[in-house]
Each structure stands twice: as C-alpha cells, then as structure tokens.
Amino acid sequence: MRADVMHYGLWLVVLFGLPVQAASIDVTAEYNPAAYEVGYGKFINTTPCLSESWSGFWCSDTSTVDQSQPLFISITIDRVVKNNNNLIDALTYLAFVGARDVSLVHQNSGKSYPLKFFFTKIGALMSPNIAKEALVNNTDWLDHIDGDCQHSLNTYASPSQVHYLYDIKPENQLAGGKCYHNKFKTTFSSKSTALKKIYLGYKLKAPDPLKMENGVYKGSLVLSIGRNKDLDFGNGTYSDSQLTINFTMKVRHQIKIDFPPGGDKVVLLPPGGWSDWIYRGKNRVPSSLRADLHYRIWFSSKIKVTLSCEYPNGSECFIKNTKDGHLVPIHVYWRDYSLITTTTAGLVFAPSVDGTPAVNADRFFSFKITDSQVLKEMMKRPGGTYKGKVTIIFDATI
C-alpha cells in the first residue's frame, strides 16, 4: 500500500490599491498553518523591507502579522506652521483612526471572516527642517511629543529634513487619537514646509485559520487622508486623499503523516495468525482476514481521504490471486473514534470532535476481508497469494 500526502502552505497578500488621488502600498504575508509547528503556525509578514537609512525605522522578514511592522507613503502635504494655540497648525500634528474591521470573503462559498487592522506608530518626513528655527532649545530634533503618542527614539534630523516616528499608546491603537508638538516659540510662523512621507506602523488581528476552509479570501478597506479624516496631519494642502487597502488571503492547510518503516506493505491474517488457524484445523474457514496499519498524523483542518485502487470494485478495491486472477473485495477503514469505510469517492474527516488540531495523533487504517463466502473461496486455493495496490490520498484542499 502506498500513502500519498499532499502538503499545503498559506499566503496572505495585502495590496494597497491606487484610485484617483490615493496612496499605494503593497503588503504581503504568508500563513503556514502546520499543526506540527509550535503554536500551529501563524501569518508571517513577508513584505519586502523598505527601511529608511535613518536609525529606528525597522523591518523584520520573520515577524508575524500580530507584531508591529512599518510602511511609508510618499505624499506631499504643504503646511504653514505657526504658534496660535491651534493644534492643527502645530509643529507636528498627527491624528489617526482607531481599529477598523474588514470582512474577508471566500471567493467560492461566500463565507466571511473578520480581520482587524490598526495603527501602532505614526510619523512623517518634514522638509525643510524648521525645528531649529521654531524650537526654544535651538535643536534640529523633534524629540518631544504630546497627546496619544510617546517618543521612542525613532527620529533623524539634518538641516534639510527631519524624520520622526512615534509610538502610539496601546490604549489608543484600538481607539484612535492625536499627537502633537506645540511647544515652540510663541512668535514663530513658518513661510512654508512640507511633509514628503507619512510613516505608519500597523498590526493585523487575523481570523483563526484553523476554522477557515481552504481557498482565497478577499476584502478591502478605504482610509481617508486630510483634515478631519482617518489620517489627519493638520492644516495644509494634501496631494493624496485616500488610502485603499485590498486584502487577499490564501488558506491551504498542511498535513504531516508518519508511517512506520515497511508501512507500504500490509499482510492480512486470520485472528491469531496462520499458525493458530492451522493448529485449530485447516478445514475451518477464518471469520476474517485483517491487518491494521498505524501511523502518526498532524493536521489542523478538515481533510478528505480517498482511495485509488489497482483493481477497482465500485467505490472500493479488490485484491487479486496471482495464479488464477480470482478477485476478492477488501474493505479499508479509517479509524479514529469509530471505524468508517474509506472509498474512492472520498470522505471528509475533522482533526477532532471539537475541531482542535490533531497533533502527533495515533491513528490507523484497518484492512479487512469479512464476507464468509469470499473467505470460503479463498480457502479453496491453498498456498495462493493475493495482491493489490491501494493508494490512500490525504487531501487538504476541500
């Protein structure tokens, strides 16, 4: 007997679309929900690292999507900074929306699952750098921040430009908020300055893939950019007005199966073996011929188990006498909590009663010949050998 195992991985692709006056960013992630991995696997953010040259803008090729990851948007926001006690004219002003829900829809079944998207960091590139002119301490650095952010040493400055990136306080990542630097010279008013990039950190709270069927899921999220919008960087003229996020998630569950050495061959025996049968009298017809094939299995979602037969017998298989071609029907049973007949049409099995992953589970297939008339015919061929190839296909694509 040969057991074919189909292994599958998971890709998450998040695409930022490009409508009119919209920023565009591509974010990709991969999900390998292997039950044999620690934690059963997670979505991995595989977005190519677009790290800036300045210290503190971070990337990780192995980070899961529930860890903060960066992105930046090239944009132009022309501003005039002035100290008039109006925060939207402050040296820095960064307002952001709270968590947003996205509906991921299976492209075949129409079944949907929730995905949550939220920001963890926010910042910008300002050019020219007017900090030294505006600040009382005569520095190029924007180390100070008030409101719903906190400084985390993620700044870089030169006379021509200043980059700043602040941590959003944990309680505001889901709720939204605003951050600002309004402590500068009371008489200061800039001629003009511009934000050339927006820096953002984000996390995804993905649906539980162990509860998702294989296939492609899609969803989208549109965020507005501008005054009193989802992303607001204060008074100014904005070159882009929205950010469209298109999500595509591919789910393919993995299977791992370990058969014992020699597991590609099984020998069917009567209860107690042939020696016992001979001892009790060869004229007696055995009640059955059977063999069990044990194996270890790891899988996290429903799988389909199908037979393929060298000698088909309807939805089951025959084995064949090598001398005279006598065909004998053999039954193949999947055994976990009960014996279930496996067929060429295939049957769907869950990893457990409650749906939790099967991890290194001990299972077995039982091969049986039980028909008394068939067994009687077989006993008329002493010394004969019956053979047949039965292929068991484990398929996670259901």
Regions found by a protein language model. Name each.
Residues 1-22:
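Gram-negative bacterial Sec-dependent N-terminal signal peptides
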Residues 9-12, 55, 142, 275-278, ...:
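Short linear interaction motif-like sites in intrinsically disordered regions of transcription factors
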Residues 13, 286, 356-360:
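Sterically constrained small-residue positions within well-ordered secondary structures
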Residues 16, 43, 53, 143, ...:
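Processing junctions and N-termini across compartments
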Residues 22-133, 203-329, 366-389, 393-398:
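N-terminal small/polar-rich segments of proteins
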Residues 95-190:
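A surface-exposed loop-and-adjacent beta-strand signature within N-terminal beta-sandwich domains
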Residues 149-218, 228-238, 351-387, 398:
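Exposed beta-sheet edge/beta-hairpin loop segments within beta-rich domains
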Residues 313-362:
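Outer membrane beta-barrel transmembrane domains
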